[in-house]
Amino acid sequence: MRKLLRVLLACLAAPLLHCAWAQPATGKTEVLWLGQSAFRISTPGGKVIVTDPWLKLNPLTPAEYKNLQALGKVDVILVTHGHWDHFADAPELALLNQVPMHAPGDMNQTVGLLGILPPNLVPRFNKSGTITPAPGIKVTAVKAEHSSVIVWKNPSTGKDESHPGGEPVGFIIELENGFRIYHMGDTGLFSDMRFIAEYYKPDLVLMPIGGHFTMGPADAAYATREWLKPKTVIPMHYGANPLGRGTPTEYMRALGDSGTRVLPLKPGEKAEF
């Protein structure tokens, strides 16, 4: 009872966001899709990881999550590259939670130099580098076959400017219980996907399937069947942009009977592991 009272008193003295109860340690992993490449991952140890947070203007994001406070207390923010549909809401989310935005090193250098975020919220790391952004959580940056640029409106001129976004990456996210998630970011096919699968052995792959800017259904099916061979795939990066026309149905048809379980979530739906 005394412990509960201390928690309640602390909440009364803290900002609204931090008065929310901490995510309970359930021993399970919950993966909530928020549209495009944005996910809210609740870890077995009670941490919350948010990837590629483009939410406010994302046509697929459920209305409740367009308010960033609805995500609750966020412990780790991961951004795969500088394109707006992956980076847009990351700075605000970092400031709101006072946690770093982890992104490719050269991208974060640009974000810091432009004053978008203060230096303590833009740590640098790069491909093959492994960090521990929260106790029990390991994140390794791996190759992605894409591009990256930051488009920023200069407050002095009111004009958009293009700035270096570093090299795009994917992330191997290892949780407290050893469960590994491969968030591929935006990528086309590259044969080192086979190496990533052999070396990191991901249990779950978050895979772009929309095409035009990333792998389409046929390419994604080839990567799944021939190189990655994961237990489970959640399709992502489709439907938010009219050019990303690939669908989970097309992907699953191209994949056939591969032994991989495909979970085509709707925005706002979650899978539990």
Curated annotation (Swiss-Prot):
Gene3D superfamilies: Ribonuclease Z/Hydroxyacylglutathione hydrolase-like (3.60.15.10)
Molecular function per GO: hydrolase activity
Keywords for the protein's UniProt record, in alphabetical order: Hydrolase
Pfam families the record matches: Lactamase_B_3
The keyword Transmembrane is annotated on this UniProt entry: no
Family affiliation: Belongs to the UPF0173 family.
Name of the protein: UPF0173 metal-dependent hydrolase Bpro_4324
